[in-house]
A protein has these predicted regions:
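Active-site and NAD+-binding cores of ADP-ribose-processing enzymes
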Residues: 2-28, 57-172
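Short active-site loop/helix that positions an aromatic residue
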Residues: 46-62
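Helix N-cap/beta->alpha junction signal
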Residues: 44-46, 84
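A residue-identity detector for tryptophan
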Residues: 41, 49-54, 141, 148
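A short, exposed loop/beta-hairpin motif centered on an aromatic-Gly-Thr core
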Residues: 22-43
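Acidic, low-complexity intrinsically disordered regions
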Residues: 37, 47-50, 137, 144
Length: 172
């Protein structure tokens, strides 16, 4: 799936609030799982294996699936797209940073560097998730995206979010 300004995105259990948005940044605590601290996590509504599917299959926070936010992103949004394992390797070569706390791999994504390069978010496609979740034949230096679980995006920049609608009751 290609993400365009027409693609409807969804996040569950969150009524997006611009005032409470926490900008994404590199996290020493989360770097080993290749996730930034902050940002807004979402999946395409039309995804064949998105957040709602993973939560339902794993019986994870299913109560949160009753409410959330639907939105789109602006046409000029710049996304780092990981649609295959080679895309992840290229991103690790360009934006990789050493993290020796990671037992098996020495390079993880440096989200501060990705953001500094002007990216508004990162999109892991369904095929990208399949290939990058637990690759068995990658180079020893390369980490994976095992903790991403499904086709998803993490948005670093709240200013690209538009056409917001809420559903369900807001969780406090």
């Amino acid at each position: 799936m290609k993400i365009t300004e027409e693609t409807e995105l969804i996040t569950y259990g969150i009524h997006f609030d611009e005032e409470k948005f926490k900008p994404a940044k590199q996290s020493k605590e989360r770097s080993y799982i290749n996730k930034p601290d902050g940002g807004l996590w979402c999946s395409p509504v039309e995804s064949e294996w998105g957040w709602i599917d993973w939560c339902t299959a794993e019986n994870f926070r299913t109560g949160s699936l009753k409410s959330g936010t639907k939105f789109k992103i602006k046409k000029d949004a710049k996304l780092l797209v990981i649609s295959c394992y080679d895309d992840l390797l290229a991103a690790l070569k360009k934006y990789g940073t050493r993290d020796f706390r990671f037992l098996y791999h020495e390079k993880v994504l440096n989200f501060d560097a990705i953001i500094h390069d002007g990216y508004d978010g990162m999109y892991l496609t369904e095929i990208g998730n399949y290939q990058c979740h637990l690759p068995m034949n990658g180079p020893a230096w390369a980490s994976d995206l095992n903790a991403w679980d499904c086709e998803s995006l993490v948005l670093f920049n709240k200013d690209i979010i538009c056409d917001i609608t809420y559903f369900g009751e807001k969780e406090e």
